[in-house]
Amino acid sequence: MASSLSMERKWCVSLVLAALCSGCATQQLRVGDLLFHVVGQENHITEVTPGMIDHVAICSAKNQVIEAIPHSGVVLTPLDSVKNREDGYYLIGRVKGADAKRSVENAFHFLGAGYDSLFLPTPDAIYCSELVQLAYVDKKGRQLFGTIPMSFHDASGRITDYWMRFYSRHGMEVPEGQPGTNPSELSKRKIIKLKGRLR
């Protein structure tokens, strides 16, 4: 989903400042913070979403995250394992106005759910940014993240060959415009404050 130029500029500035932040060490990571995975090379997800972020995880304990990942579904992962993944790095995002404890508890309700590789709003499987969207609430229990129209097209507006083939194998049309989320767009929401790079 395309963003306004001013929003893109603000996000780029935030991204640069976060990447340059030298004081943002692991001990500053709080329960309820989000970890956005920034890749070094474009892939089939970043090709159709704004920015180079292709995954998001939730800090669920001092040295642990909860995340939805392909083949495994919603799982708990040691923080060191996350940090040691080869490609790219992680940015810490703090959700302003969130009830962090309750939001993490909500995420735990999805533990063991399958991974939604089709990126559809189904109750029996879930993908990474959908976990965040469904789990995060404010102090009054109100959801903090709404959905957006899903995008499977590139900058020219053309649905990419990858996604055409992917959904064709499942006997489906590409769910362009269906309600959903993506990690890159989530990172640009006004209620997300990028705190720096996970080290």
List where the protein language model places each region:
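Gram-negative bacterial Sec-dependent N-terminal signal peptides
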Residues: 16-17
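Active-site nucleophile-His-acid catalytic modules used for acyl/amide transfer and hydrolysis
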Residues: 90-150
